[in-house]
Amino acid sequence: ASCLVGSEMCIRDRIYYGNYEFYKECITNRDRMFDCPQNLREEEMFEVPDWAANKVVYQIFPARFAASQQVDKEQWYKAPISSMDDLHGDLRGIIEHLDHVQNLGIDVLYMTPIFKSYSSHKYDIIDYYQIDPSFGTTEYLRELVQEAHKRGMKIVMDAVFNHTGREFFAFEDIMEKGEKSKYLDWYYIEKFPLESERGEIPNYKCFGYYGGMPKLNLKNPEVEKFFTDVACYWIKECDIDGWR
């Protein structure tokens, strides 16, 4: 709050704008600070494929879109929803609601990550070759793509190739073997031993200062090949239409 005394402005209360909320005290934890938007580099520019031009895209967060099984209604309809809540939505639930999505005039379904992970958001992926069991199986994904295609809709999946989860095999190897790990150059490790206490800045680069999502070194040819293979695998295996 502020007041005007003569021609002078006096400030009675001061608050600080953080990443998640407002704070009364100066923010010292970088994880809570507001991040400025990053500029797009020229080498990251790409051409939009013809089929995607002028299309209406509908984003789905699978864990909270629709559940095919009986769920806890009290949990499903509660408010507010926390970032860690898992409401047990799944791929079958999406399939069962494709007619509704089609009637909305949607051309492209974009799903946030569906691969194996311990979180509800699935951005800390453990295994890029396994659908998280809570969502279903590869067969369910294949059926979802087929049913979407029957309705003239495309399926785009989330390419989480910037970082992995800590339980991803390469990072686990580093945690176990330290500087002797053959995957050392897959990440940006600053020093050993690795540390990532909650609320503290890890001693390795990661997404949003969050230690559970160590950042990949995409300049490493082995990393590039691994994730190129992942992208090609799901296109061939399930006929998905693209990656975001």
Cite the ranges covered by each PLM segment.
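Generic structural signal for beta-strand residues in well-ordered domains
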Residues: 2-3, 50, 121, 209
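Short beta-strand elements
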Residues: 14-45
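Compositionally biased low-complexity segments at domain edges in trafficked proteins
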Residues: 33-64
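Substrate-binding/active-site clefts of carbohydrate-active enzymes
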Residues: 55-57, 61-107, 114-238
